[in-house]
Amino acid sequence: MIIKRTKDIKTFNSLNKIYHITAQLDNINRKKNKKIRIKGSTVAKTLFTGMFFREKSINQIMEKTHKRKLYQKLFKNEAIPKMHGFVDGIKDLNVNDIEKININTIKKAKENKMYRNGTIDGLLVVGLDGTETFGSYKKKWNNCYNKKIKNKKIINGEEQIIEEEYHEQVSVFARIVGKRPGILLGYEKVTSKGNKGKQEYEPNVGINLIKKIKKAYGIGIDVIVGDAIYLGKKFVKEVKEEGYHGVIRLKGNNKNLIEDAEGIFKKQKAKQYNYKKKTIQYWSDIFEYYDTEVKVVKYSETDDKGRKQEIYVVSTDVNMNEKTINKIIHARWDIENNGFHELKHQWNMNHCYIAEENAIDVIMQMIMLSYNLWELYIYGHLHNFENMGITKIGYIEEIMMIFIVNKGKAWYSSSA
């Protein structure tokens, strides 16, 4: 049974007019491997459709295209390649062309004042975090992240500890947090560099990502929030130089700062307020941190079941309200709980579609594009999704069913 969501599907169809997705996909080029005869735009549109439908493998995309003829309906005037041609085409796509579509989509959302009121207390907050997307003991690709893992193996009937090399795709992502749509602004890979496999330092990759974001989107972002791994001299300096404020968790990797703060806080009387079924006490003061002033806040939080936790937070904005800092540091979990969880388990970011560096980046950019479009549609353009009584994935599947029945005419009118 197909539910008629006439108003919703009309809004969904308007996305292509707002963000000009298929027109931009038509302009995607290949890197000109002469052995491949299929157009870059055809490969790109087919791959985008597969990612938009959240397909779990290249095999599924090909099966729904050629055997079940579902996607073929969307491209009546184009010859879609079979498996080997499609894979070779993905490897040859220009990833910069796809990245530009992502940037243009986010700029359009900004132009449409999607975040006019910020995401937390009037501030637009971006969370930074690194994660492993997928890994393999067998497959290896250029610039993957390598590490040694000790595993138990049965050899000649005896259990032995064997050290094996593990290859994984590790990236630092930037995502808008505090309020949905929680769109992804970009990512940077953490790689192994040098002949000895020396690993890059995640905060350095985060710095590169911040610079990339500033170059792509300019002004508009107010705060970068991150875990304790990012709290260091270089990161704090770069965040401020790019014109942002940083709100960063403080843990044992900055032991001296914690000890200095604790010494001061013992002499202070705690301030207290209630927020979201929690009683929150806090102490705060301004400290010198690598030639710059920062505000350090200690929170002692007790929930309605009596459970307690203490957290220390650093803010590079010494004038930021302690209640706002608390909201921001808790919003940091959005990128993991909503972002990474959905991307890995619902958008299949944890699956290695093709173990080749350019293909990995092409597919990641396509996953970003499809994820962001759904976020913008559901939480930005619908306005009433929270009152529908349906899960996000259940709703997406309903809309896509209608989309296929209508042969995607509003999106693929030139080929339908």
Predicted regions, residues:
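Structural motif
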Residues: 32-43, 159-164, 304, 353-364
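Short, conserved catalytic/metal-binding motifs centered on acidic residues
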Residues: 46, 61, 82, 122-136, ...
